[in-house]
């Protein structure tokens, strides 16, 4: 029986998690198949990850977008989220979601009733928690990609295979090993010969000259 998600993710133990997800339909992120090229779908995931890391208190330390699945190593930054003001939380949540009018009134100082103020403050904390939630992060990633692919395929139904898998990274050795494992995925799968030629991976992005001055600990941060 699969472990409940709250048993797989325990931020009190570690902030690093290796996430993997596989598609149901064989055509997902493949290159050429049946006369169609789906390579651009891998770019969808990379661009969505960039957007989500600008919104969530979650960094991407390593990633590899494969033909029919992907690997992402994330770091949850609870301290960063704890320091956000109410205005920052509303702005970040509003990147993808509608913020209720009463919260906008709270931010403007227009709420008078204590119950309304308390409700607004409670909602702030709910949003703060969601912005550190791996489940919400993955939901915002995977539902978006599924909608795009289903529209392109002119079909409906499940796009992803069950739940995403999450592996807690508990020490520095495991962190390094996981990053190496993710970085070398395309080479093991024989779809690339070298790290720098591994398309849609964090290792190729780090090696690229334009990224030599970037923070090598996080692909997106």
Language-model features: where?
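Short catalytic/metal-binding and nucleic-acid-binding patches
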Residues: 1-221
């Amino acid at each position: 029986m699969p472990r409940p998600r709250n048993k797989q993710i325990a931020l009190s133990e570690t902030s690093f998690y290796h996430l993997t997800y596989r598609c149901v339909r064989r055509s997902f992120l493949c290159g050429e198949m049946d006369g169609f090229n789906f390579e651009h779908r891998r770019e969808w995931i990379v661009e969505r990850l960039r957007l989500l890391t600008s919104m969530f208190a979650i960094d991407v330390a390593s990633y590899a977008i494969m033909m029919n699945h992907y690997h992402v190593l994330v770091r949850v930054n609870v301290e960063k989220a704890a320091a956000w003001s109410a205005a920052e939380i509303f702005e970040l949540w509003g990147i993808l979601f509608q913020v209720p009018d009463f919260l906008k009134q709270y931010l403007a100082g227009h709420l008078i009733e204590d119950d309304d103020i308390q409700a607004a403050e409670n909602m702030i904390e709910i949003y703060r928690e969601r912005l550190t939630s791996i489940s919400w992060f993955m939901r915002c990633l995977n539902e978006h990609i599924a909608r795009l692919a289903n529209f392109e395929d002119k079909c409906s139904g499940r796009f992803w295979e069950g739940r995403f898998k999450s592996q807690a990274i508990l020490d520095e050795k495991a962190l390094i090993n996981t990053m190496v494992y993710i970085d070398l995925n395309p080479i093991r799968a024989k779809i690339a010969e070298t790290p720098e030629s591994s398309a849609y991976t964090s290792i190729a992005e780090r090696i690229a000259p334009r990224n030599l001055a970037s923070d090598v600990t996080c692909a997106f941060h």
